[in-house]
Amino acid sequence: FVNPPTTPLMWIRWVESGAQQNLPLSLNSWIPIEEVSPNIQKAVIAAEDQKFFIHKGFDWLAIEHAIQTNITTDRKLGASTISMQTARNVFLWQSRTWLRKLLESYFTVLIEFFWSKQRILEVYLNVIEWGDGIFGCEQAAQTYFQHSSEILSPVESAWMAAVLPSPRRWTHRPTPAHVKARQIKILDALPHIRVHIK
């Protein structure tokens, strides 16, 4: 499969910046899954989708729980799996419309059918937004820790996964208390997460 050269979100962020950032012509920091530290692989699974290697794109129990929570409380809970987030980031825009959600479900089914779990995780780690103008784990590792994602430690990986719900706000230093708490929770979960890379 061909690696995605860019994503819709990269172009949206470029427009939002008033064209001040460089044109998002390519994801030039792409790194194969075999060269990505298992620590960051485990961390994003622990933080975002612990059933990633089990489900077929949708975590129906999480979706049901999110719907009930959103109806009965003021909290807005999401239930997007890594597969759903990958489909959204590669093919779609970031709005919360029903049309986008419908298309996201369609593309999730497609990538689960045509791509292996390893390929989905590889694409996710290379396209996900990790800060203002920062896309993919390699660029994030170089920006925040000044080294390759290949040697990310468990602590660094847990921090990177902890900021994913809101990377443009939560990556500001000093690290907010709720991000630190989330980082510790992810770090505690790492020994129980297995990645299946062929």
Where are these regions (language model features)?
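Juxtamembrane regions of bacterial inner-membrane/periplasmic proteins
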Residues: F1-K198
